């Protein structure tokens, strides 16, 4: 069984940024990244075809909005991505369409300050670039969904549904809340919340407070529609990068 100093569950922007930050800070211990998807991305994932290596479409957030003034640590993570062309400013405009199909004022009426940035060639390239800043001490376990968590005084034990795959970790980071939020009960038809089962109520008052707060957060199902228009010659001006439906 593999044993790590640190295991990060979730290869979205949060998990990948953490790993890149630890690299810059000189973290030396063996680290593992565990992700249910076939690659990094999380909420900024890009869906790749299983049969056509050239086919890929963004089906998560199409861009991220960055304020004009970023903390130096964040800027230090993003600068290599900008320099490599992996993170690029969005130049196309946004439009809003009403129920009658008419273009109306841009939504929201008072946008937050900052600029939109997107990944190239696809949005998941941002997370891939962040992981590229990590050393070869990082081991990635993709297409692996953690189902069971167990906690002892010495380590965490992680297992998949069948328990054929297992890891041990001195430290554990959940970069998403699926293993800590009741939404997993309905979404994955589990009968328990893994983190709550691993640390029974009363064992850790601080964790109890966190899980109570997290439990109060709402979760609703969302569906994404992915369209492949093929090789279409669009006329100028360029298509809007985002269309808001009101």
What are these regions (language model features)?
Residues 53, 166-244:
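Central helical "cap/lid" subdomain
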């Amino acid at each position: 069984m593999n044993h790590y100093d640190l295991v990060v569950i979730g290869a979205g922007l949060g998990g990948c940024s953490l790993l890149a930050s630890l690299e810059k800070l000189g973290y030396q211990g063996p680290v593992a990244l565990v992700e249910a998807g076939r690659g990094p991305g999380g909420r900024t994932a890009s869906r790749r075809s299983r049969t056509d290596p050239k086919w890929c479409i963004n089906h998560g957030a199409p861009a991220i909005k960055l304020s004009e003034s970023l903390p130096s640590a964040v800027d230090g993570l993003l600068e290599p991505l900008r320099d490599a062309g992996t993170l690029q400013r969005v130049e196309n405009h946004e439009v809003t369409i009403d129920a009658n199909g008419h273009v109306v004022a841009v939504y929201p009426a008072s946008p937050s300050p900052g600029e939109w940035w997107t990944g190239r060639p696809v949005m998941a390239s941002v997370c891939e670039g962040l992981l590229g800043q990590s050393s070869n001490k990082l081991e990635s376990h993709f297409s692996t969904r953690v189902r069971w968590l167990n906690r002892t005084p010495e380590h965490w034990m992680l297992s998949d549904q069948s328990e054929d795959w297992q890891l041990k970790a001195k430290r554990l980071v959940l970069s998403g809340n699926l293993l800590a939020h009741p939404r997993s009960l309905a979404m994955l038809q589990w009968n328990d919340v893994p983190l709550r089962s691993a640390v029974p109520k009363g064992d850790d008052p601080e964790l109890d407070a966190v899980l109570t707060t997290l439990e109060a957060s709402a979760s609703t199902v969302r569906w994404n529609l992915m369209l492949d228009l093929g090789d279409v010659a669009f006329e100028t001006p360029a298509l809007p990068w985002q269309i808001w439906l009101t």
